[in-house]
């Protein structure tokens, strides 16, 4: 099987420096050792990009979307991006599908509606071994990938805003025609 392209892992965090932008990391440390690795990767990527960040914890992955909604409602201008971190390991019941699908659906809906740069670092795996491999900063670094995704979207929003401003300025300039009568 071919190795997936690791575009996010290969990004130079310093190249996507975001100055004083502030990001919110919301973690669900249900599996503490996995959460610690995810958080370490996310914090390292944000630090290299010179971003400021806060970390809050909630009991589980289903609580991450409501925590993000509360944070955005209570402090709408405080955060320029967010990162969700957690781990859902398949068990013997349908609970895995509910938690995985509903947390992803709610987060996607929220960040699209709010147009918030976001990185989803909630692992959905079959085993704890898979989770540890993906979370480890040395191997999978999915926490770092989630932070880099949020950083890249933040940069995109800033750069696209500049493109739009330039286009609007160009559109307002009078058109000079030659040969006027």
From Swiss-Prot:
List of residues binding (2S)-2-hydroxy-3-oxobutyl phosphate: 92-93, 134
InterPro entries: LS, LS/RS, LS/RS_sf
Main enzyme class: transferase
Superkingdom in the source lineage: Bacteria
Keyword Transferase belongs to the record: yes
Entry GO CC: cytosol; riboflavin synthase complex
Gene Ontology biological process terms, A to Z: riboflavin biosynthetic process
Enzyme Commission number(s) of this protein: 2.5.1.78
Entry's transmembrane regions: none
Active-site feature positions: 95 (proton donor)
Function noted in UniProt: Catalyzes the formation of 6,7-dimethyl-8-ribityllumazine by condensation of 5-amino-6-(D-ribitylamino)uracil with 3,4-dihydroxy-2-butanone 4-phosphate. This is the penultimate step in the biosynthesis of riboflavin.
UniProt record similarity statement: Belongs to the DMRL synthase family.
Protein's name in the database: 6,7-dimethyl-8-ribityllumazine synthase
